[in-house]
Amino acid sequence: MFVTSKKMTAAVLAITLAMSLSACSNWSKRDRNTAIGAGAGALGGAVLTDGSTLGTLGGAAVGGVIGHQVGK
């Protein structure tokens, strides 16, 4: 079974996000939620727009705003 470059990119992005967030243990809960939302939004935007840069950045922006507002 062959792994497509899109799936490989998504896996690398998810692993990088998880590793980078673990290094930020002194962040406030709101900061963590914002970063997680931005990462999830970027991943979702990239998948939905077939890797479009604009879709990835838009997803990250929307996800970051949603993550920031969660639990307010």
From Swiss-Prot:
Entry's Gene Ontology cellular component terms: outer membrane; plasma membrane
Induction field: By elevated osmotic pressure in the growth medium.
Keywords carried by this UniProt record: Cell membrane, Lipoprotein, Membrane, Palmitate, Signal
Lipidation (S-diacylglycerol cysteine): 24
InterPro entries linked to this entry: Gly_zipper_2TM_dom (IPR008816)
Membrane-protein topology: Lipid-anchor
Residues forming coiled coils: none
Pfam families: Rick_17kDa_Anti
Signal peptide from the UniProt entry: 1-23
Cellular localisation: Cell membrane
Record-linked PROSITE patterns: PROKAR_LIPOPROTEIN
Protein's GO biological process: response to osmotic stress
Covalent lipid adducts (N-palmitoyl cysteine), residues: 24
Described purpose of this protein according to its UniProt entry: Provides resistance to osmotic stress. May be important for stationary-phase survival.
UniProt name for this protein: Osmotically-inducible lipoprotein B
Natural source organism: Escherichia coli (strain K12)
Gene that this polypeptide is encoded by: osmB
